[in-house]
């Protein structure tokens, strides 16, 4: 068996990365793609590797030189018109090579783990196209297969239909052809197709024609979770660098992204909590039905959004400002009330108190913390520890603040997930404590809409709210987020049911976590469960282990925080933990 790599393309979409180099010279985590794949091919006992080169071909040949002479025999074919042709011409230049031996055919812009090549080489079937179930990041040629893994259709980019994605598999651009298949089927069709359609086409089009006109001997070989990525642009390169980072670096590579984990479909994010039982399918269907209109329309200004949010919260429009997530709330508060000073969070000191291992605190603890501060933030329920103070205890602190000229800012984003907590967001409470209380809530979090970034800040002090509004851009949330706010009241009973489901699942999840000997599980009434590691590992070490198993978690010191997700997702995590 031999290998052929098509490496003649210019890779224009990679911009500066391919300004002076071909795509396979691009580095992922300090290793060039060409070095990686040659080493992988070198472990397969192949007779030779044939590289079809073009753009910056001499530079590639000079780089390879004789460094792999003891690994694999390397030969070259030149495509002198690489800038006027596509990969069908590069492959046509190698047609005689294809007919000489069984061949692994690869493109030069893919990165994959070792098992990918082992999977296709070890499979006894002679003619295979490696494929993977469609995911949102995939682009290019798709195939449809039957239950025998026969390819019934090649779907070019122009024929792609999003409504059919459940039936699509993406070609990984790794093929295995027997020399008989190349000689008797593929190469004759390749010659004919090139003569009719020209040389600015893709070689997959030939396979598409074969499936239409010929009982093809080519079968699909679906991957089973093996990692791979196609690198077409700088964003792809960034994602591939994260996917293929080494064990110690991988967790930090993911963590520094902060979010956007939808780009990694295999990853389940337990680092940030959100309501997994809301919105309902019906609410999402309503949002989808209006999506085209919403993305083509400007959102309303602050006053309209505050009116809608106030209606949902049960408070007057003049007491509410709508923000683009909690991050915007904290930013505007620092610029208005705190004049650039750091916000003080109540739990920060308690985290350092070894005499309080469960991080429990009550009204008296908060008052003591407040003694030398003009204002502070109380997260209730606390997202880190899961501690939750009853409404009467929180109001005890607010009363004390009022008597001492201080301000308590309460973040109650998780209050609907708690057993004991109760919202402070009402006209009566806000008006009574207009000088000493401000309330914040992340609607995105409680309603399971983290991608829409919606938060509210409320106070009975209308002048303060007015100042906050003036410091926030009028169009600070988009039309889709505004629409979600607008229709929420229609689904309020579903929302309440979702919170009950959340509490029930958290109880089950906590009980299951308590069965692991390496955890001390701290009781929680928030959207996450805090676990102390008792096996000597640090949180970072533990999270590094989890990320290798496609689980993202967060923590500090010896404490790991695990968000409560759906039963299905939680069971995935429990299965991972059981195998440790």
What is each model feature region?
Residues 502-507, 513-549, 564-566:
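Conserved PLP-binding catalytic core of the aspartate aminotransferase-like
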Residues 2-5, 31-101:
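Conserved N-terminal catalytic core of the sugar/cofactor nucleotidyltransferase
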Residues 239-296, 372:
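N-terminal "arm"/small-domain region of PLP-dependent enzymes with the aminotransferase-like
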Residues 113-197:
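Conserved core of the sugar-phosphate nucleotidyltransferase
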Residues 436-515, 519-521:
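PLP-dependent aminotransferase class I/II
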Residues 293-402, 409, 414-434, 438:
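Conserved core of the PLP fold type I
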Residues 69-141:
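Conserved beta-loop-beta/alpha segment of the NTase-like Rossmann-fold superfamily
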């Amino acid at each position: 068996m031999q290998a052929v790599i098509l490496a003649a393309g210019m890779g224009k979409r990679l911009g500066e990365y391919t300004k002076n180099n071909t795509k396979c010279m691009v580095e992922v985590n300090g290793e060039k793609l060409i070095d990686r794949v040659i080493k992988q091919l070198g472990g397969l006992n192949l007779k030779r590797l044939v590289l079809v080169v073009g753009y910056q071909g001499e530079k590639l040949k000079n780089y390879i030189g004789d460094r792999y002479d003891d690994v694999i025999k390397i030969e070259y074919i030149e495509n002198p018109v690489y800038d006027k042709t596509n990969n069908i011409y590069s492959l046509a230049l190698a047609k005689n090579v294809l007919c000489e031996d069984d061949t692994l055919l690869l493109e030069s812009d893919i990165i994959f783990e070792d098992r990918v090549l082992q999977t296709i080489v070890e499979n006894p079937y002679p003619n295979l196209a490696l494929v993977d179930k469609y995911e949102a990041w995939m682009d290019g040629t798709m195939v449809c297969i039957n239950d025998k893994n026969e390819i019934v259709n090649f779907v070019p980019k122009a024929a792609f239909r999003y409504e059919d994605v459940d039936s699509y598999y993406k070609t990984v651009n790794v093929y295995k052809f027997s020399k008989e298949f190349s000689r008797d089927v593929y190469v004759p069709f390749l010659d004919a197709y090139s003569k009719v359609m020209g040389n600015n086409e893709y070689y997959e089009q030939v396979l598409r024609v074969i499936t239409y006109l010929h009982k093809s001997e080519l079968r699909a070989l679906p991957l089973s979770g093996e990692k791979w990525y196609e690198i077409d642009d700088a964003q792809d390169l960034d994602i591939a660098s994260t996917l293929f980072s080494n064990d110690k670096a991988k967790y930090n590579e993911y963590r520094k992204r902060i979010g956007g984990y939808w780009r990694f479909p295999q990853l389940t994010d337990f680092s940030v909590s959100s309501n997994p039982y809301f919105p309902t399918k019906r609410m999402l269907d309503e949002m989808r039905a209006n999506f085209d209109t919403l993305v083509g329309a400007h959102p309303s200004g602050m006053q309209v959004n505050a009116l809608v949010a106030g209606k949902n919260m049960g408070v007057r429009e003049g007491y509410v400002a709508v923000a683009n997530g909690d991050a915007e709330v904290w930013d505007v508060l620092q610029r208005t009330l705190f004049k650039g000073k750091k916000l003080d969070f109540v739990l920060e000191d308690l985290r350092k108190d070894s005499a309080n291992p469960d991080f429990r605190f009550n009204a008296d603890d908060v008052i003591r913390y407040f003694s030398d501060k003009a204002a502070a933030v109380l997260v209730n329920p606390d997202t880190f520890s899961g501690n939750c103070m009853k409404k009467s205890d929180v109001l005890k602190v607010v009363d004390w603040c009022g008597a001492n000229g201080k301000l308590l800012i309460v973040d109650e984003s998780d209050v609907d997930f708690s057993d004991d907590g109760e919202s402070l967001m009402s006209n009566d409470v806000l008006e009574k404590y207009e000088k000493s209380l401000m309330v914040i809530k992340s609607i995105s979090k409680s309603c399971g809409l983290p991608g829409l970034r919606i938060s509210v800040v409320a106070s009975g002090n209308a002048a303060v709210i007015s100042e906050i509004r003036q410091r926030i851009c009028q169009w600070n949330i988009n039309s889709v987020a505004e629409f979600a706010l607008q229709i929420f009241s229609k689904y309020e009973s579903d929302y309440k049911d979702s919170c009950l489901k959340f509490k029930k699942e958290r109880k089950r999840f906590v009980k299951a976590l308590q069965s692991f000997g390496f955890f001390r599980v701290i009781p929680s009434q928030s959207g996450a469960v805090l676990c102390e590691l008792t096996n000597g590992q640090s949180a970072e070490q533990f999270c590094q282990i989890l990320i290798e198993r496609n689980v993202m978690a967060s923590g500090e010191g010896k404490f790991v925080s695990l968000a409560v997700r759906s039963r299905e997702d939680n069971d995935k995590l429990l299965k991972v933990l059981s195998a440790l």
